[in-house]
Structure formats: C-alpha cells, structure tokens
C-alpha cells in the first residue's frame, strides 16, 4: 500500500499566530515537521498551506508544498483539497501530521502506518498513557477513551474524545496524528460538522459518528 503524508498549516492559528514560521536552530517549525516526516520514510510528503509565505519557506528549505484555500474549518478539510489538487491515483493511505509539532516522534509515524496496513483500518490515530492524573483536568491535553485496554500490538475502537475527564479506566493522552484510507478521507470531509465537534473543538468527534476511528 502507498502512503502520502500531508501536513496542513496556516499562519492564523488561534493559540500562537505565525507559529509555523517561527525558527528553531535557524529552521522554521513547519520545515522541521516536513523533515521529520521525510525521515519516517513511509512515502512522499507535502505541506498543504493557506499562506504563500509557508509554501515559499518549505520550498526554500528543500521541501514540497501546495497552496490551498483559506476557508477550511479543519486541517482535514485542507488535506482533502490538497489531495484532490494533486490528482494522484495510486495512493491508498493519507497520513495527517500536525504542522506545529517539530519534535514529533518518527517511530510514531511509522508505527501508525504499519498498524493501518496490517489491520486494513479505515482510520487510525495514536494514544499514550497518562502519567500525571492532573492531566485529566487539563483542557489543553486531549484525551481518548478506548473500548479496550491498549498495548503496542493492538488497535482498539475509540469510544470518545474529550478535553476534561474524571475517568481513569481505558483513558489515554491522544497524540494528534491521523491516518485514513483515501475513501474514508473523502467520506469524512463530506460529513457536516456535528454540534459535539464544534462545541469541543475536536474534529475527530466527527469520525466517531461513523465508528471509523481506531487507536
């Protein structure tokens, strides 16, 4: 199976505007993410950006980028526009990496890709154990509740995503990396945003409505 990694990015981020172009060791954050994705060696990588400045920066630093529209409600919608523009016919999976995570673990990328292929899943994401119970009440740390206890060799159905929780059983820190089959990506963006998704600012809740997502 062939995987394409698409990294959505924009300058007008809510928490820290302009973050993709902030420099770490003389290289922009978005270019760091691009290079980490390349190092995972799972397939081609491209940045999907709504700002020409981001496109120019990525290309200047040896990467690939495509300009998208500015009116997307989520990063996944931006990814789908980029995928359609590329007109690639031989791609099976789309890997979605967050454009503001320069220290993303390369092993996480390869592990998710491997699990998607071996389990023939429609959509997958990652989670890690919560080490500090204070994180359960931290709205900046997204949590996921799974149907079954997780281990590194097993995918489980996601039951819920949330920002605050008092639950302890089968609850994990959600890692914001996704992989979809191309058919699932299309189905996902064609769904209307749910009230739950909008109120919680978590687009992955849309996937729960179709029972698509596994951890």
Q: Where in the sequence are the language-model features?
A:
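Residues that scaffold the ATP/ADP-binding catalytic core of kinase and kinase-like folds
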Residues: 57, 82, 187-188, 207
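Conserved small/polar residues in nucleotide/adenosyl-binding loops
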Residues: 213-215
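Conserved core of the sugar-phosphate nucleotidyltransferase
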Residues: 105-194
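Residues that recognize and position ribonucleotide moieties
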Residues: 14, 102, 178, 200
């Amino acid at each position: 199976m062939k995987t394409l990694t698409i990294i959505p990015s924009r300058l007008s981020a809510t928490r820290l505007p302009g973050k993709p172009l902030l420099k770490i060791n003389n290289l922009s954050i978005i270019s760091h993410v691009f290079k980490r994705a390349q190092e995972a060696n799972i397939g081609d990588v491209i940045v999907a950006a709504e700002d020409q400045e981001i496109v120019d920066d990525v290309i200047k630093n040896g990467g690939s980028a495509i300009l998208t529209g500015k009116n997307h409600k989520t990063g996944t919608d931006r990814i789908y526009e980029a995928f359609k523009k590329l007109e690639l016919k031989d791609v099976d999976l789309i890997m979605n990496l967050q454009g503001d995570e320069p220290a993303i673990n390369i092993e996480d990328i390869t592990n998710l890709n491997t699990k998607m292929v071996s389990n023939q899943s429609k959509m997958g994401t990652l989670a890690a154990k919560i080490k500090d119970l204070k994180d359960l009440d931290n709205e900046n740390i997204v949590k996921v509740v799974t149907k079954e206890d997780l281990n590194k060799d097993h995918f489980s159905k996601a039951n819920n995503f949330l920002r605050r929780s008092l639950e302890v059983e089968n609850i994990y820190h959600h890692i914001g990396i996704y992989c979809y089959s191309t058919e699932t990506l299309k189905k996902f963006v064609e769904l209307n945003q749910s009230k739950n998704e909008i109120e919680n600012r978590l687009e992955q809740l849309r996937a729960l409505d179709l029972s698509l997502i596994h951890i």
